[in-house]
């Protein structure tokens, strides 16, 4: 985006991500760590050295489709992400992992990402929870008054009618545990290193 505000470190490398993508995965294996590896492969990020960061969506950061975003990652590079992870080795136990986003109307300001992992929650339940959580965090920085005790769908309308939150969304993965196997689910928001983004994409309005 031509309006991106850059923050650079001493070497001049851009440390504020301009692009990201959402992904999810599930893995099943008799070994816990191998199940996690399978989930990373399912999510398309097993070849990166992932570093978990906290919950800020940078100003002007664009969300790319997963298939497009994956093309800008290189094997072995340090890749920042917000990750939710859940695992079980219990038969028939429902697990879920979810990432929620809340995007402000004013893209000069930052948004929020939230992560959540749970037992016994469906995709829809976990997804609504993370969207709600991200929206609440953003609402508190925007001075939006809301009732934390009403249902998310009602609160969602209040947030969006206020004009300061333009969009909320989530990506969620759930699975049911299998006997004698570890099952792992993950959901991620992956920040693409800015030096990997073509200039033509960076300059696009």
Residue ranges of each PLM-predicted region?
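Helix-coil modules at protein/domain termini and other flexible surface or pore-lining loops
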Residues: 5-205
């Amino acid at each position: 985006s031509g309006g991106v505000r850059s923050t650079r470190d001493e070497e001049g490398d851009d440390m504020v991500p301009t692009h990201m993508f959402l992904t999810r995965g599930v893995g099943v294996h008799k070994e816990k760590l191998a199940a996690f590896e399978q989930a990373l492969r399912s999510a398309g990020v097993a070849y990166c050295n992932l570093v978990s960061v906290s919950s800020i969506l940078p100003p002007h950061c664009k969300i790319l489709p997963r298939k497009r975003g994956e093309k800008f990652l290189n094997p072995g590079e340090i890749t920042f992400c917000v990750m939710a992870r859940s695992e079980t080795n219990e038969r028939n136990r429902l697990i879920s992992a979810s990432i929620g986003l809340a995007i402000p109307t004013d893209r000069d300001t930052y948004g929020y990402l939230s992560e959540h992992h749970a037992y016994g929650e469906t995709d829809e339940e976990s997804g609504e929870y993370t969207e709600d959580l991200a929206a609440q965090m953003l609402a508190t920085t925007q001075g939006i008054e809301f009732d934390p005790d009403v249902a998310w769908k009602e609160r969602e309308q209040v947030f969006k009618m206020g004009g300061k939150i333009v969009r909320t969304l989530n990506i969620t993965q759930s699975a049911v545990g299998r006997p004698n196997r570890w099952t792992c689910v993950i959901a991620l928001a992956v920040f693409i290193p800015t030096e990997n983004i073509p200039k033509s994409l960076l300059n696009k309005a």
